[in-house]
UniProtKB/Swiss-Prot annotation:
Family note: Belongs to the Mirabilis serine proteinase inhibitor family.
Positions of the record's site feature: Reactive bond for trypsin: R32, I33
Keywords of the record: Disulfide bond, Knottin, Protease inhibitor, Serine protease inhibitor
GO molecular function ontology, one term from the record: serine-type endopeptidase inhibitor activity
Role played: Trypsin inhibitor.
Protein name: Trypsin inhibitor 3
Source taxonomy: Eukaryota, Viridiplantae, Streptophyta, Embryophyta, Tracheophyta
Domain comment as written in the entry: The presence of a 'disulfide through disulfide knot' structurally defines this protein as a knottin.
Amino acid sequence: EDKCSPSGAICSGFGPPEQCCSGACVPHPILRIFVCQ
C-alpha cells in the first residue's frame, strides 16, 4: 500500500511526484535534500 508523504517530509527528487500528498517534491532552500511541498 502506498502512503503519501505529508508536507515537509523528505522525498526523493527523482521519485514520482505522487509520493507526496501535495504531488510536489521540491528542493529544500537550505539543506541539500528534497521535501514535499
